[in-house]
From Swiss-Prot:
One Gene Ontology cellular component: cytosol
Regulation: Allosterically activated by GTP, when glutamine is the substrate; GTP has no effect on the reaction when ammonia is the substrate. The allosteric effector GTP functions by stabilizing the protein conformation that binds the tetrahedral intermediate(s) formed during glutamine hydrolysis. Inhibited by the product CTP, via allosteric rather than competitive inhibition.
Reactions it catalyzes: UTP + L-glutamine + ATP + H2O = CTP + L-glutamate + ADP + phosphate + 2 H(+); L-glutamine + H2O = L-glutamate + NH4(+); UTP + NH4(+) + ATP = CTP + ADP + phosphate + 2 H(+)
Record domain Glutamine amidotransferase type-1: where: 1-99
Subunit structure: Homotetramer.
Function, in words: Catalyzes the ATP-dependent amination of UTP to CTP with either L-glutamine or ammonia as the source of nitrogen. Regulates intracellular CTP levels through interactions with the four ribonucleotide triphosphates.
Family to which the UniProt record says this protein belongs: Belongs to the CTP synthase family.
UniProt keyword terms in alphabetical order: ATP-binding, Glutamine amidotransferase, Ligase, Magnesium, Metal-binding, Nucleotide-binding, Pyrimidine biosynthesis
UniProt cross-references to Gene3D superfamilies, sorted A to Z: 3.40.50.880
Pathway(s) it belongs to: Pyrimidine metabolism; CTP biosynthesis via de novo pathway; CTP from UDP: step 2/2
Name listed for the protein in its UniProt record: CTP synthase
A GO term for molecular function: glutaminase activity
Gene of this entry: pyrG
GO biological processes: 'de novo' CTP biosynthetic process; pyrimidine nucleobase biosynthetic process
Length: 99
């Protein structure tokens, strides 16, 4: 389990109701930070960072209703009666979008 620092007012920080996420990780791939500014300039938001190693953990596209991608694995800590905040937020977005 690693601590991911969540950007204030990001969707993911609202879902977790926190400025950090504690989730399991399995790093085989990393985002190449040399592309960060280019991708930010076209609307990608880097909303979660593992600060100890400056690793991008969460990205969002704020212009879309729900677009969150994570390097951590929320499925490892979800349980049938206790889903992680990312899963709950995703299901809620689906329901609200289909009204």
């Amino acid at each position: 389990t690693m601590v991911t620092k969540l950007e204030k007012d990001s969707l993911v920080s609202k879902l977790y109701n926190s400025d950090v996420a504690l989730e399991r990780h399995r790093h085989r791939y990393e985002f190449n930070n040399k592309y960060k500014k280019d991708l930010e300039s076209v609307g990608l938001r880097f909303s979660g960072i593992y600060e100890e190693k400056n690793l991008v953990e969460v990205i969002e596209i704020p212009s879309l209703k729900f677009f969150v991608a994570s390097q951590f694995h929320p499925e490892f800590t979800s349980r049938p009666n206790k889903p992680t905040p990312l899963f709950k937020g995703f299901i809620k977005a689906i329901i609200e979008n289909n009204k």
